[in-house]
Amino acid sequence: LYDGIFGVCKKIGGEIMVQFGLRLHDAEKLPLEELLPIVKGKGFSCVHLALSKALKEYPCTPSALTPGYSNYLRHLFEKNELDIAVIGNYLNLASPDEEYMKVAREKYYAHIRFASLLGCGMVGTETGAPNVEYKYCPECRTEKSLSIFIKELKPIVKCAENYGVTLAIEPVARHIVWGPKVCRKVLDEIGSHNLQVLFDPVNMLDLDNVGHREEVFQEAIELLGPDIAMVHFKDFVYTPGEGYGLKSVGAGTGEMDYTNILKFLKKEKPFIYATLENTTPENAAWCVENLKKQYDQLEV
């Protein structure tokens, strides 16, 4: 039996659990007032909220993110006993287009302010690519690109500090922060307690490292563990000749073994938010229940 009061997901008897959530734009396409009870009913206790994707009926420009809007959303989520685990604002922080960057900075500042008004402690972001298309290129893995990213990140982290919000960066194999060592370098160089990590294991994989993925995950836990503020759960299947050769799917429907990651969370991260991605409305409830069962059965 699970007690989901205001997002606290725990087994009766006091065993600490992960707080499993859903990336909201993977859910049914319904008005928010109708959607949230469905999400709660599937066994989720929190959501990953990307305003531009999940709330398309409303503008998400900086000027639209007012205290009134935040209170409306906060009350609606509280009514349905769902936490907003993170607000996603996934823009390219290394674009060479200065006009784009001006707009992007303002969006980050506005999302951080909005998160503080919502009572949401975290804004999540990926780390970009040094081109206007926001796509992988060999220059993603250069010191020059990393320096550009860090320069752009610093004022955004400062804004997060001012509002008491955590900015969580998500390493992705095809982006500038492409692995655990690079991510550790960013954290150390900026040196802020308000800069942490959103750990998405599948996003750290590509065809070059997928064969030794457990080593990749272990390195991430060893180097980034103290700074991991949230986790994304999804899975992958091989797609030879398509895209990058790996396709993201719902957790438990592909090749991933989450045993060691779940053990880490159970031992080190009480009540951490962990949102599922790439689910469908048809399989989301099964995916989260499967993860809960795996988690319960683990001994640490």
Functional labels for PLM-detected ranges:
Residues 29-39, 103-112, 213-220:
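Short, acidic/polar
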Residues 33-34, 71, 76-79, 94-197:
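Active-site acidic/histidine proton-transfer and metal-coordination neighborhood
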